[in-house]
């Protein structure tokens, strides 16, 4: 039997370092395995918001304020302070939701959607709101009678009977809360009838970051809010400036038949002013479907979502998603890498919604204009006549793949000048049933000989046909004199 050899000091040190390294790895692994449970440990949550306060003191300053607020699609960095003071006053005002369409809206912060609130888990949010619905809208329009309004934060865990009570015009409500869960949460007015208040524009987003931030680093961060508008021409025939006024159509609202489905409050809202990114960047989109009644299938053409965090919580992770399905008030954070230079179109892949305006563009340095008409990228025409506006929107959503107005023939003729070549009655019959016209009308037969693809029947209503013709007349009257383009 031999005696054991005493290890050298160097060997003893190496062994100690190895044991320390293994011990640290085990501890780190244990911490990581415990961290999800720790994040949702009830004892760490704050359930002491304190009572709400309602006063008769009217605020007359800015309609929205606070370092935690973002006022457009770009999300501002998180403010350092753990105390976030925000103000979101309610107003009745006029917004533009489409070319030639001014809408009598109810708002938070005098915009639709309302400003985005950006906080983190554990922050103390100090909220105040004055009901300013009795203040005249721009141009001294009294759009609707002043009324009660309230605030419902989905990010808060509070007694709604206290915090979400309705206040009268001129009153001010204030309360505090602490967000206990990360996510992308809706806020909205909760005053009956809630449906009408949300459909009139009273909604927005609260982004609650995890205590320790997100597991990835994004190069670009944008907030996308999908919502519906249900409109009809103002029965009093008022206008906002030179733009006809539209008001809420309660019948369409109850039938779930929206006139527009939009991103960030505007028809094709981020097309003329696209979001910006660069090839190779990680883009993070905070997406909320505010409804009030429809579903969204959010998709970015040319991208695959590397990570999807349902409801905006990184613990609810999916990978490699093509489309995210969101019900009313549902949300997700989606991330993707921009693969190369180009224009990336955001759409609701329920294309009936996309045709109503749920379209946007992420411009990643496209070198030339792309032909993406089938995603409803709009032309530049902006009529103000209500029927011409509807005709324009229908033309852009259904016709741009085959026709232009002034940019030359495609699969079908350039339609600029069509009202100078054809009578309204001929156009009415053509739009009602092009397939029947081709077999019976000489002019239609000539078109069929010139263009090999016959236009299929579109099943248009009489009202839709009238709107198309009004739009064609507007385009022909607005264009510079030139030779008719259509044979």
Predicted regions and their residues:
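Histidine- and aromatic-enriched segments that form or immediately flank copper-ligand environments
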Residues: 86-207, 293-326, 344-362
């Amino acid at each position: 039997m031999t005696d054991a050899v005493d290890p050298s000091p160097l060997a003893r040190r190496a062994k100690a370092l190895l044991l320390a390294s293994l011990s640290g790895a085990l501890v780190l692994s244990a911490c990581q395995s415990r961290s999800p449970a720790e994040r949702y440990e009830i004892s760490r949550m704050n359930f002491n918001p304190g009572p709400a306060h309602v006063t008769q003191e009217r605020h007359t300053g800015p309609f929205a304020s606070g370092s935690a607020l973002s006022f457009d699609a770009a999300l501002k960095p998180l403010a350092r302070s753990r105390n976030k003071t925000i103000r979101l006053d309610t107003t009745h005002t006029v917004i533009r939701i489409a070319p030639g369409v001014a809408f009598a809206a109810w708002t938070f912060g005098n915009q639709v959607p309302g400003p985005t609130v950006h906080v983190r888990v554990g922050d103390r949010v100090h909220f105040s709101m004055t009901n300013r619905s009795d203040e005249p809208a721009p141009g001294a329009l009294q759009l609707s009678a002043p009324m009660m309004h309230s605030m419902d934060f989905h990010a808060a865990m509070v007694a709604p009977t206290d915090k979400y009570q309705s206040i009268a015009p001129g009153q001010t409500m204030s309360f505090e809360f602490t967000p206990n869960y990360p996510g992308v949460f809706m806020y909205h007015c909760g005053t009956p009838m809630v449906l009408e208040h949300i459909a009139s524009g009273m909604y927005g987003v609260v982004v609650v970051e995890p205590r320790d931030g997100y597991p990835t680093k994004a190069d670009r961060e944008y907030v996308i809010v999908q919502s519906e508008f249900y409109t009809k021409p103002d029965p009093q025939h008022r206008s906002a400036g030179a733009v006809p006024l539209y008001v809420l159509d309660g019948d369409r609202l109850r039938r779930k038949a929206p006139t527009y489905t939009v991103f960030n409050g505007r028809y094709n809202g981020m097309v003329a002013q696209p979001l910006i990114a660069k090839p190779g960047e990680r883009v993070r989109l905070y997406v909320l479907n505010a409804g009030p009644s429809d579903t969204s299938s959010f998709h970015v053409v040319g991208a695959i979502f590397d990570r999807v965090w349902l409801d905006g919580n990184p613990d609810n992770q999916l990978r490699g998603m093509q489309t995210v399905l969101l019900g009313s008030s549902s949300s997700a954070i989606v991330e993707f890498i921009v693969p190369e230079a180009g224009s990336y179109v955001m759409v609701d892949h329920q294309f009936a919604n996309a045709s109503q305006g749920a379209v946007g563009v992420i411009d990643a340095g496209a070198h030339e204009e792309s032909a993406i008409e089938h995603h409803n990228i709009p032309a530049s025409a902006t009529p103000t006549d209500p029927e011409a506006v509807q005709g324009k929107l229908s033309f852009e959503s259904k016709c741009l793949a085959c026709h232009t107005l002034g940019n030359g023939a495609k699969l079908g003729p350039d339609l600029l000048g069509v009202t100078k070549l054809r009578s309204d009655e001929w156009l009415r019959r053509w739009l009602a049933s092009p397939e029947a016209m081709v077999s019976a009308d000489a002019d239609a037969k000539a078109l069929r000989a010139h263009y090999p693809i016959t236009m299929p029947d579109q099943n248009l209503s009489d009202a839709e046909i009238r709107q198309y013709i009004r739009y064609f007349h507007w385009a022909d009257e607005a264009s510079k004199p030139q030779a008719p383009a259509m044979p």
